[in-house]
């Protein structure tokens, strides 16, 4: 591992881009209020830098940055900008309220991008880097420059680009594996050689941003650390463009479990990993696969008799980390019908929610109603309540009636619209779910094409609930929806409304969002 850079911090800086690159994952768009909720959780998780969006390309991202900056003081808050003067100036304005602002500018450097995307020569790229990094530094002290598609850029030219960016005032240099093309050995060697051959390399932090197109994002990020990188850009659950990004939960647990090998730490409070992962799944309606490392439902499950026997003798036989280390443990505080508002507020804070008085009052009323239906209230239940009461403003399900008539089913749904007015519609379909979705489409005016639909149980025993997950298309864009209820048909309706409300709340979702992928 490269340890010759004396200015590098003794730990890895975690740069979370869930709210920017992660949001570019199909169906994962978040409006400003949802981004604030997620940013609170990332702050509680201990993330060093939170990239909130691309304000020059989206008014919603501009508003999200403003909301987040007003509240969060500890982490550095970053926004992404192209190497364009207007973009940079807009981004700087969005950062005005931030206590620790960072302006993140990028420009493609590979021959493929120079020829077909930018139509710029090497000299023009170098000139643009110098001009726009210099401009950024006059507006914001903390400037990160990313050489997009760095891993497919000629090494001698990448050295020159990096030198120019540092000379112009960049404080962090990011060398992304934009299309997930590289191998760990290539990434390690690239960072080692760039750091060794660039004048001023000891004055900046080097960063890696690896995509998962070949399933190597985490491995490549670890290799970058071995090569001298001291910032890793990642997302919760690995969401992001195409196959996604380096998964924060996997990277941080590798560094923790294999600390004797890497000998470097992060600031992440790992016991909050699972709750943060589950919050994101709820907000964007995209569940992780059950066998997902660290945060999947089966991550600590043992079914084989041989494995179970070993676990009974000693957990270390088949577990390299304890479930409690990442948050797979129930709260010691049991919430139920006798719990007070202070207890509910404390648990919500632990899950990353900081509520105003009016919102807390509304959530607590919903909590008491839920306690009349079930004995105990879990973290999953609280996250569902937060969706229903403070995030998912829009159409609310008031009632529904499903009936089967021969080979056809009838559905009657009654909704409360965003203005509080009641809307009722009926529809027929090939089965109860088909009829239900038809009635919901008629009531909301939103047309969704169903790709996949799954229902499974969450929770334990009598308090278990059904969770519906569906994948749909709208205007050729894919979206994921999640709903939870004691009744699986109601859960299905809530999952459908989850998508519809996101589309209706954010008009940008009704169109194809501008592709601003930096990877």
Curated annotation (Swiss-Prot):
<keyword id="KW-0100">Branched-chain amino acid biosynthesis</keyword>
<dbReference type="InterPro" id="IPR002034">
    <property type="entry name" value="AIPM/Hcit_synth_CS"/>
</dbReference>
<feature type="binding site">
    <location>
        <position position="209"/>
    </location>
    <ligand>
        <name>Mn(2+)</name>
    </ligand>
</feature>
<dbReference type="InterPro" id="IPR005671">
    <property type="entry name" value="LeuA_bact_synth"/>
</dbReference>
<comment type="similarity">
    <text>Belongs to the alpha-IPM synthase/homocitrate synthase family. LeuA type 1 subfamily.</text>
</comment>
<dbReference type="InterPro" id="IPR013785">
    <property type="entry name" value="Aldolase_TIM"/>
</dbReference>
<comment type="pathway">
    <text>Amino-acid biosynthesis; L-leucine biosynthesis; L-leucine from 3-methyl-2-oxobutanoate: step 1/4.</text>
</comment>
<dbReference type="Pfam" id="PF22617">
    <property type="entry name" value="HCS_D2"/>
</dbReference>
<keyword id="KW-0963">Cytoplasm</keyword>
<dbReference type="GO" id="GO:0030145">
    <property type="term" value="F:manganese ion binding"/>
</dbReference>
<feature type="binding site">
    <location>
        <position position="245"/>
    </location>
    <ligand>
        <name>Mn(2+)</name>
    </ligand>
</feature>
<feature type="region of interest" description="Regulatory domain">
    <location>
        <begin position="396"/>
        <end position="519"/>
    </location>
</feature>
<feature type="domain" description="Pyruvate carboxyltransferase">
    <location>
        <begin position="12"/>
        <end position="274"/>
    </location>
</feature>
<protein>
    <recommendedName>
        <fullName>2-isopropylmalate synthase</fullName>
        <ecNumber>2.3.3.13</ecNumber>
    </recommendedName>
</protein>
<keyword id="KW-0464">Manganese</keyword>
<dbReference type="Pfam" id="PF08502">
    <property type="entry name" value="LeuA_dimer"/>
</dbReference>
<feature type="binding site">
    <location>
        <position position="211"/>
    </location>
    <ligand>
        <name>Mn(2+)</name>
    </ligand>
</feature>
<dbReference type="GO" id="GO:0005829">
    <property type="term" value="C:cytosol"/>
</dbReference>
<keyword id="KW-0028">Amino-acid biosynthesis</keyword>
<comment type="subunit">
    <text>Homodimer.</text>
</comment>
<keyword id="KW-0808">Transferase</keyword>
<dbReference type="InterPro" id="IPR000891">
    <property type="entry name" value="PYR_CT"/>
</dbReference>
<feature type="binding site">
    <location>
        <position position="21"/>
    </location>
    <ligand>
        <name>Mn(2+)</name>
    </ligand>
</feature>
<dbReference type="GO" id="GO:0009098">
    <property type="term" value="P:L-leucine biosynthetic process"/>
</dbReference>
<dbReference type="InterPro" id="IPR013709">
    <property type="entry name" value="2-isopropylmalate_synth_dimer"/>
</dbReference>
<dbReference type="InterPro" id="IPR036230">
    <property type="entry name" value="LeuA_allosteric_dom_sf"/>
</dbReference>
<dbReference type="GO" id="GO:0003852">
    <property type="term" value="F:2-isopropylmalate synthase activity"/>
</dbReference>
<dbReference type="Pfam" id="PF00682">
    <property type="entry name" value="HMGL-like"/>
</dbReference>
<dbReference type="GO" id="GO:0003985">
    <property type="term" value="F:acetyl-CoA C-acetyltransferase activity"/>
</dbReference>
<keyword id="KW-0432">Leucine biosynthesis</keyword>
<dbReference type="InterPro" id="IPR054691">
    <property type="entry name" value="LeuA/HCS_post-cat"/>
</dbReference>
<dbReference type="InterPro" id="IPR050073">
    <property type="entry name" value="2-IPM_HCS-like"/>
</dbReference>
<keyword id="KW-0479">Metal-binding</keyword>
<comment type="function">
    <text>Catalyzes the condensation of the acetyl group of acetyl-CoA with 3-methyl-2-oxobutanoate (2-ketoisovalerate) to form 3-carboxy-3-hydroxy-4-methylpentanoate (2-isopropylmalate).</text>
</comment>
